[in-house]
A protein has these predicted regions:
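Conserved phosphate-binding elements of NTP-dependent enzyme cores
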Residues: 1-975
Length: 975
């Protein structure tokens, strides 16, 4: 076995054509080639899958049953393979409890740090807290007035499930006669033992003593306190009742030998790491349970259309709740309140007075309102205060036991920061434990809480800990912890993530950001001898930050690892030790090793399209003319954008043009376009529940008809989804087969030719074409269905043919073949031709959507848009459409974008790729830096204007590519 190479023999996974090659070990190897050529099939579906499979096979059969096992890839054999770790572009899921701090395990170290070095404060007054001794506790209790009745309790069980029979029996044996169980005092009687529900949570506190404050009671009190502290493990509770007030409720006070506030007399548990976890009941905010947000009724969803009147049903929920009687009842409510406020029923909501709208939404308080309701066929007057629409809906939601009703009410709710913890997830006493001495604005407590620390950007947190001065004792306690946190923060700064905040939810990260976080985590792990496989780590990264990313990847290699990167970025390819160029085309036209060697050897290869782009022989040209923004066409104007780090930004987007929004990572691009523009449009036009980002207004949206977001998400999540179903061609194909004479004679309709429903499909495989066989300790095996031979349909359905082909044959046609085959059927020829024009001619009509790359899925969506009748008033939003695209694919993508633009539509593209930016008609460059250093518009104008702007990082790199001479034959030269 070679120690210098990974030797792959006979790789046939997906479209790989019996590929055999040697990949040098302990090197930085870049796999490149057109989208769909087989790069991921080689890197992830062959190399990683086999490395993972061999590792899992080394485990016991018992362990294997708990793991997701990968199928053996279609390859003869692989030699010299190390344990493999894949760092892909997948996001981290939508779990709201997962943040950057928890994902990177920084939060675990922070919990240790705050538990050992944090200074506790009283959450009410901000005064530092100190520990109480047993004597001090006795002194505090003895200050109660003479004749005060009190009980000393020791908590022995807190919020735990179980019967606790042994605990109660032990207390009885020790001589105790009373306990408080779930707030109720009960006697310990052996004849009538206390029985608890084993499935419910309980709190059990033993009554150590019952005392009346008087002279000479101190010795007994001290003895009781010591006993209670021993049983309560350092904690006790005192219930006392004022003298001569036997009917007053008992006042409860917690005392602890750990933390005590002299200002308020309150005691708290000594903080432990668990107290700083928002996933633990000990630390989580009791209102939002550690989520930091909760569902609340949103006035903008309750009154979605402010041009409607009360008479016409401006208050949306009251139009749809219950039957006719309830609708009539709510009409009576609204009418009564409107008359009380002097609000005309026929006036639009937005024209009502502020006072009238406030009363309708929040209630009349103590003021009584006259209501008239029908009772027994006659109107009946009722006088009472009006609780308000919002309190009424909140009460209905809280009281309803009907899941249907609650789901219906959820349509009017959105997520808002929790009022109790202000979105910080933890209990007040844990938020009052701080590090440092600098007082933050609006806080009673000096220093930073763990939530304040997590609200810092990664770069700011790195600086904060760097300036943290430790005493010798503190250094011995937490020096290693701080070093580990700083190391992880430093790695993330190095891969260009310094602008992200530690409390950012993992689900909100882009694929590139999530991947770079995992990359930083792997560097911190310090593993050696591993095969790392990375999927386009440069995605979402500005050119300025590329060098730091490459240095990080080199560090992985220099530690003694083999690093394979699937990448299209020119700088990354040039930095590689070895390049594998897969191609020459995509799909059935790819799967071959076109060239391999150093970047210089790739550039010298006549067969390599990648090499020709690297050498400058081919390039995406600068357009000779651009579409000039015209005032008569109009502009979308975003005024006063202040969401996240945006600093009162005013942005103008010319209609009918291709606009690129650029800037370093974290400068505010996605906030401006996605959080503000898209969310505002989707809420106004489509009733979306997503809250738009903060801004004053967006002008001229009425000049557009609709908004479409085109991303690289899969077009379907099941193998049944394919290009024919997505583009709508399959409906036309089924109608075509149903119109064949034989089908009409047999009475077959279009449904007969669907593989999703009973009738025409093969029932043995239920239209899948394959059968899944579970192998228990091995991964499941998929075998071709014997009944239909993988064709999905039953024999009778396959007997129906059109021009000699049955429905299964049609689904096996490539797009290029379909263009010719359906030349006489306009409804099928046109979409086939569009798919071919966007470079997808190699796809099969019935190819499973799950096998498509991100670039292929995106071009499929663009083709579907091109196939529709163009109205010229559509706003298209694209976020980094060049993800996963080769130079050649970017040229094809631009052709499609130009077609959409030439149809009069408006395209807004968030992009880092300079080839796309240089061909744009208009550029909005944000910056100058990321995070708190960004949020400003550095330049707006043509690419040439941005390139000439001092202080623009984008402009600096744009200058170089704008010098490339335009090609006279390039279609991108059209204005």
């Amino acid at each position: 076995m070679s120690k210098e190479f990974i030797r792959v023999v006979g790789a046939r996974q997906h479209n790989l054509k019996n590929l055999s090659l040697e990949i040098p070990r302990d090197r930085l190897v870049v796999i490149t080639g057109p989208s769909g050529s087989g790069k991921s099939s080689l890197a992830f579906d062959t190399l990683f899958a086999e490395g993972q499979r061999k590792y899992v096979e080394s485990l016991s059969a018992y362990a294997r049953q708990f793991l997701d096992q990968m199928q053996k890839p279609e390859v003869d054999h692989i030699e010299g393979l190390s344990p493999a770790i894949a760092i892909e572009q997948r996001t981290s899921g939508a779990n709201p409890r997962s943040t950057i701090a928890t994902t990177t395990e920084i939060y675990d170290y922070l919990r240790l740090l705050y538990a050992h070095l944090g200074q506790p404060h009283d959450p009410e007054t901000g005064t530092p807290m100190a520990c109480q001794s047993a004597t001090e506790i006795v002194d505090r209790i003895a200050l109660l007035p003479t004749k005060t009745r009190l009980m000393v309790l020791a908590p022995v069980v807190e919020d735990q499930r179980g019967e606790f029979r042994d605990v109660l029996e032990r207390l009885q044996r020790e001589g105790f006669v009373r306990v408080r169980v779930d707030g109720q005092i009960q006697e310990l009687n052996p004849k009538e033992p206390i029985r608890l529900d084993a499935k419910a949570t309980h709190t059990v506190e033993v009554v150590v003593d019952r005392i009346v404050i008087a002279e000479g009671v101190r010795v007994r009190l001290a003895d009781s306190v010591e006993t209670a502290l021993r049983w309560g493990e350092g904690r006790l509770k005192v219930l006392h009742q004022a003298p001569d007030r036997p009917t007053d409720p008992w006042t409860e006070t917690l005392h602890s030998t750990r933390m005590y506030s002299p200002a308020t007399g309150r005691s708290f548990d000594t903080p432990t790491p668990q107290h700083f976890s928002f996933n633990s009941p000990k630390g989580a905010c009791p209102v939002c349970h550690g989520l930091g947000q909760k569902m609340v009724f949103d006035p903008s969803l309750i009154v979605p259309d402010e041009t409607k009147t009360l008479e016409d049903g401006a208050v949306q929920p009251y139009r749809r709740m219950g039957g006719k009687k309830m609708v009539s009842y709510y009409k009576g409510l609204i009418k009564g309140v409107a008359q009380h406020c002097g609000a005309p029923l026929d006036r639009p909501w937005k024209e009502l007075s502020e006072e009238a709208r406030r009363t309708l939404m929040h209630g009349s308080g103590t003021d009584e309102v006259d209501f008239w309701f029908m009772s027994g066929g006659a109107p009946k007057k009722t006088r009472k205060p009006f609780e308000g629409v919002l309190p009424n809906l909140e009460r209905l939601y809280a009281d309803s036991e009907s899941e249907f009703t609650r789901n219906r009410l959820k349509a009017y709710m959105t997520l808002h920061p929790c009022d109790a913890c202000r979105g910080r997830r933890l209990r007040p006493e844990m938020l009052a434990v701080t590090l440092g001495s600098e007082a933050l604005a609006g806080s009673k407590v000096p220093g930073r809480s763990i939530a304040d620390f997590c609200s810092l950007s990664i770069a700011e947190a790195h600086v904060f800990l760097g300036g943290f001065v430790l005493s010798d004792l503190q250094r011995r306690i937490a020096g290693e912890v701080i070093l580990e946190i700083r190391k992880r923060l430093g790695f993330m700064v190095e891969v260009g993530l310094g602008y992200l905040t530690l409390d950012r939810e993992s689900g909100s990260l882009s694929g590139g950001e999530a991947q770079r976080i995992r990359l930083a985590t792997q560097i911190g792990a310090g593993l050696v001898g591993v095969l790392y496989i990375l999927d386009e780590p440069s995605i979402g990264l500005h050119q300025r930050d590329n060098d730091r990313l490459l240095e990080t990847v080199r560090r992985l290699r220099d530690a003694g690892n083999s690093v394979i990167v699937v990448e299209h970025d020119e700088d990354t390819i040039r930095a590689a030790d070895h390049v594998l160029d897969i191609g020459p085309g995509a799909g059935i036209h790819g799967g071959e090793l076109v060239a391999q060697g150093t970047p210089a050897e790739i550039m010298a290869s006549a067969r390599s399209v990648t090499g020709r782009y690297l050498s400058g022989d081919l390039c995406i040209p600068v357009p000779r003319h651009r579409v000039d923004p015209r005032e008569d066409k109009g502009w979308i104007e975003i005024i006063g954008a202040t969401e996240n780090n945006l600093r009162n930004v005013d942005a103008r987007i010319p209609l009918g043009t291709l606009t690129c929004v650029t800037g370093v990572s974290g400068s505010g691009k996605s906030t401006l376009i996605d959080d503000i523009l898209r969310r505002t449009v989707f809420r106004q036009w489509y009733g979306s529940k997503e809250r738009p980002g903060a801004h004053r207004e967006i002008r001229n949206l009425e000049l557009l008809e609709k908004c479409i977001v085109i991303d690289q998400a899969a077009i379907g999540r099941t193998p049944r989804s394919n290009p024919a179903t997505y583009t709508g061609m399959f409906n036309e194909i089924r109608d075509l087969f149903a119109s064949v004479a034989t089908a009409r004679v047999r009475g077959y309709d279009a449904g007969r030719f669907s593989f999703n429903v009973k009738g025409g499909r093969c029932e043995k495989c239920e239209g899948d074409g394959v059968l899944k066989i579970e192998m228990h300790f091995l991964p499941p095996v998929y075998v071709t269905c014997e009944a239909c031979a993988g064709k999905r349909y039953n024999r009778e359905t396959l007997e129906i043919t059109y021009k000699g082909l049955n429905i299964a044959d049609i689904l096996q046609l490539t797009v290029d073949e379909a263009v010719n085959f359906f030349r006489a059927v306009p409804k099928l020829h046109a979409p086939s031709l569009t798919l071919a024009e966007v470079g997808l001619g190699y796809l099969r009509l019935g190819q499973s959507a799950t096998t498509l790359s991100g670039g292929e899925a995106q071009r499929l969506k663009l083709a579907a848009e091109l196939s529709r009748r163009q109205t010229g008033r559509v706003l298209y939003l694209l976020d980094e459409p060049t993800t996963g695209l080769h130079f050649q694919d970017i040229a094809k993508l631009l052709e499609v974008l130009f077609k959409l633009r030439d149809g009069g539509n408006t395209l807004v593209v968030i992009e880092h790729n300079l080839d796309v930016i240089k061909t744009a008609d208009w550029v909005i460059d944000l910056g100058p830096e990321g995070g708190s250093g960004g949020g400003q518009i550095i330049a707006q104008g043509t690419p040439e204007t941005v390139a000439a702007t001092p202080g623009s990082h984008t402009g600096r790199y744009l200058t170089r590519v704008l010098r490339q001479k335009p090609s006279p034959t390039s279609r991108s030269n059209r204005g």
